[in-house]
Regions:
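Catalytic cores of carbohydrate-active enzymes across secretory and cytosolic contexts
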Residues: 1-852
């Protein structure tokens, strides 16, 4: 007899998406939920919250998930609640009025590419400052009615969630996103199927990417994900993690963003005037754009003229190590088919990504490729412009760093997103009615001086109380999960003083951010935080990259210090720094502190967000604060570096922090006089809002991009593209002609009134004459005298004197100028020859230089 008590097969699961069944009267709620306009609209959030405050909190303020989980009977009742329907209709009316406005077609249209977007904590496609900036940019583009579309990647797991063990060790957790519960929608084709882009990754295979759309107000953000059953087990995870995996997966992601992104726009029939690479990750858009023009009948040189003329590259990192470099073998594995499509050699393609063309040992750098295929390049602050000019100087060796064309637009923040509701109401009640449309107008902001001090102070106290409640709630949950001793938790909150000055520090934990600086002299810090006359507390938050052991060590060190008896309740580290935590921190603390190594902070925007909430900044003069600092409106550590020795400099900066806390900041905060607040502290707040805030809004940033880059790019592109690309073809031919004759050009003679002597008299002018055989180039070159001076360990331009072409005899051109040096000292002089053409946007566009 056969006997068995076990017979079970494997379930054949299939995915089923059950949509929320809203009563017809409430369908407007779903429409609003699927547009991220709600992320910066307080009335919408209040509408959802009032329906079920507990559920709204439970779903982490995700309206799509909220409508899925809310009790259906409650919805039916609400559909017949006249008061609620009235509120909903008012919000929906405002939404439709906003959305239905046509974009401004008088301004150039933009295609924007970024690896990450920080739009809301609900949509986990961001990790840090780059994403925050990109998310804010889309929101302001929507508010400013700009014709812009964006491309990014949709990550299944996003960036990691952080938890801390009892001893402060960072633990990385990844939670899969359910795309059906996010404020995104599938991009559908006429046949009713989701649009899928087939991206070539090598000659032998393609990767299939699903296309999604997130509506950011009026702006469409198209997102690609590779979790498609048509893909292999090796390719489905390409978009699982933001900045996850090895260098091979990073390259796969960047191919998807750049090449796949352009293929997506083509499939959707979208063309724009300007293509903006937000960091080098997106640079491969220009590979695909070149291919498209070449497929249309142009050659490589002609296509490059058009691509360059309509491309902008924004660099965010201030150090060479922060850029993506790929070994030639790896790059060849995925890109070997492109030289044939472009009509160039493999070495030609590699050289587009090298500082030193022809150097076989040099890897392919996306940032270098971006510089060489984009007409315009910009840093993200005034100081970062100079840093970037130095960093990219090897690409344009014929020019000194300060001469190259790298510009800047200082980052700003989206005011409606980061300004707390109470502050927005205060501004709305007291400022000009056009305030939100004219945020860069300092005259409007100066109305803050007319707001009573008590109102300013009470608004600050409300935000601080909200933060303290948030901290207690968050820590209770986090510490329970990590099994922190309950007695320790009680002791921390017993010693926490709600009336103490509160200083916040929140950012990515990389060593150059110097989170450890405050702890340089532990004994002195203990005296400061335990001074009963001037109580002060510090709140830290931030994630370290999973591969950054030093950054994780800093977190562990701070957590360990915070558990010491003298620091209990005085220093707290909050885990899992995300947009929600950031929003509470930057509005609730009294001071926002930032202590990076000098020239290591490209811009930084967290301090700008704090600024919009009446929080004062205390920072190194780097990034945005180098431009923003005003006396009596915050505090600064000097931008000067005293010691080359990093340890000595850290000690000096720590001393400055302690001194300013003890002698300036704390006495000012507690100078109550006869009131329950410090009048001088409120004066600092008003100065900060009136004098600094108007210069760091995203509205100002967007306007700057148009004024400094988009307008001229669009104008130049349309000149080249007119009449079937006539001038693009002409410029390509002209450059080819210059290349072929350049080495043959002869310098026939150089004459100078001083006889080219090494010693000349200060202030005495003399004539310089240069005769050149241009070899048939027909006045296509320029000559200039370059005088340099050695200062600060480097050679810098003292003066550049252009020589004028005064006569021609066959191919012989005579150039003359009057020269002279009006300061005594040691100088160097040389002559520089370069190609010239009225259609060149700048010299680095065609970087041919001969020194003589």
């Amino acid at each position: 007899m056969e006997y068995s008590s076990y017979n079970v097969n494997t379930p054949q699961w299939r995915e089923i998406t059950v949509g929320s069944h809203l009563p017809a009267e409430l369908r407007k709620l779903a429409e609003i939920a699927h547009n991220l306009w709600w992320t910066w609209n307080d009335d919408v959030k209040k509408l959802y919250c009032d329906l079920d405050p507990g559920l709204w909190k439970e779903v982490e303020q995700n309206p799509v998930l909220f409508l899925e989980r809310i009790n259906y009977e409650k919805l039916v009742a609400l559909a017949h609640d006249e008061n609620f329907v009235y509120k909903m209709d008012a919000v929906y009316s405002a939404f439709k009025k906003y959305i239905d406005v046509e974009p401004d077609h008088q301004r150039p249209s933009i295609a924007y590419f970024s690896m990450e977007y920080g739009l809301d904590e609900v949509l986990k496609i961001y990790s840090g400052g780059l994403g925050m900036l990109a998310g804010d940019y889309l929101k302001e583009a929507s508010d400013s009615n700009v014709d812009l579309c964006a491309i990014g990647l949709l990550y299944r797991y996003g960036y990691f969630d952080q938890s801390l063990s009892m001893d402060g060790q960072q633990t990385v957790n990844y939670k899969a996103q359910n795309f059906g519960q996010l404020p995104i929608e599938k991009v559908m084709q006429p046949d009713g199927k989701q649009l899928v882009i087939h991206v070539p990754y090598a000659d032998s295979f393609v990767v299939h990417a699903n296309v999604w759309k997130a509506s950011v107000g009026r702006i469409p953000l198209y997102l690609l994900d590779t979790d498609n059953e048509l893909n292999s087990e090796f390719d489905r995870p390409i978009t699982h993690h933001l900045y996850g995996g090895d260098w091979e997966n990073r390259l796969k992601q960047e191919i998807l963003l750049g090449i796949g992104g352009m293929m997506t726009l083509k499939a959707l029939g979208i063309t724009k005037d300007v293509y903006h690479c937000n960091e080098g990750h997106a640079a491969l858009i220009n590979i695909q754009r070149l291919c498209d023009y070449i497929n249309g009948g142009l050659n490589f040189g002609q296509a490059m003229e058009l691509v360059r003329a309509s491309s902008l590259y924004t660099v965010h990192t201030p150090v060479p190590a922060g850029h993506d470099y790929f070994d030639e073998g790896l790059f060849n594995k995925y890109m070997k088919g492109y030289p044939g499509k472009l009509g160039i050699t493999w070495d030609n393609l590699m050289d587009l990504g090298r500082h030193n063309p022809g150097d076989k040992e040099e890897r392919f750098c996306m940032s270098v490729f971006a510089c060489k295929t984009c007409q315009e390049v910009n840093g993200v602050s005034k100081l970062h412009k100079s840093v970037s000019q130095q960093m990219f100087a090897p690409i344009w060796k014929g020019y000194f760093p300060e001469e190259n064309h790298v510009g800047y637009v200082t980052n700003g923040v989206h005011l409606p997103t980061w300004c707390a509701a109470e502050w927005k109401k205060l501004f709305k009640d007291n400022f000009d009615e056009n305030f939100f449309c004219d945020q860069s107008n300092q005259k409007i902001w100066e109305a803050v001086y007319g707001i009573p001090d008590e109102e300013i102070w009470n608004t600050r106290l409300k935000q601080k109380a909200k933060l303290l409640d948030y901290i207690k709630s968050k820590c209770s949950k986090d510490w329970l999960r990590s099994q922190v001793d309950p007695a320790l938790s009680v002791s921390i909150f017993e010693r926490f003083n709600p009336d103490a000055l509160l200083i916040g520090f929140g950012r990515r934990f990389a060593t150059y951010k110097r989170a450890h600086l405050l702890f340089t002299d532990i004994d002195r810090l203990a005296r400061i935080v335990n001074n009963p006359k001037y109580p002060v507390q510090f709140i830290f938050a931030g994630k370290a990259h999973p591969n950054d052991g030093a950054g994780q060590g800093l977190i562990k060190q701070i957590v360990e210090i915070s558990r010491r008896p003298e620091f209990l309740g005085k220093i707290i580290f909050l885990e899992n720094y995300d947009m929600d935590l950031a929003r509470h921190l930057i509005s609730g603390v009294d001071i926002w502190m930032n202590t990076p190594m000098r020239l290591a902070e490209a811009s930084g925007t967290s301090g700008e967000k704090a600024l919009m909430n009446g929080v004062l900044n205390f920072s190194v003069l780097d990034g945005w604060w180098y431009e923003g600092y005003r006396k009596d409106a915050g505090w600064a550590l000097t931008d000067k570096r005293t010691y080359q020795n990093e340890q000595y400099q850290n000690q000096l900066d720590a001393e400055a922090i302690y001194y300013l806390l003890e002698h300036d900041i704390l006495p000012l905060y507690y100078e109550y006089g006869g009131k329950n607040y410090s009048e001088d502290w409120v004066k600092y707040i008003k100065n900060s809002i009136a004098q600094i805030a108007p210069h760091f809004t995203m509205k100002r940033q967007l306007d700057d991009y148009y004024d400094r880059f988009y307008n001229k790019l669009s104008e130049h592109f349309h000149i080249l593209a007119a009449d079937n690309f006539a001038k693009a073809k002409m410029m390509a031919d002209w450059k080819a002609n210059v290349r072929s004759r350049w080495d043959a050009i002869e310098i026939k003679s150089i004459e100078a009134g001083n006889g080219l002597n090494a010693t000349i008299e200060a202030g005495k002018e003399y004539e310089v004459t240069v005769v050149v055989d241009e070899k048939g180039l027909d006045d296509a070159i320029g000559i200039e005298s370059v005088i340099i001076r050695h200062e600060g360990g480097q050679d810098h331009i003292y003066e550049v004197i252009p020589l004028s072409s005064v006569s021609k005899n066959g191919n012989l051109y005579t150039f003359k100028a009057t020269s002279g040096i009006f300061n005594a000292g040691s100088f160097k002089q040389a002559f520089r020859m370069y190609p010239k053409n009225a259609l060149l946007p700048h010299r680095q566009d065609f970087c041919y230089v001969r020194w003589f």
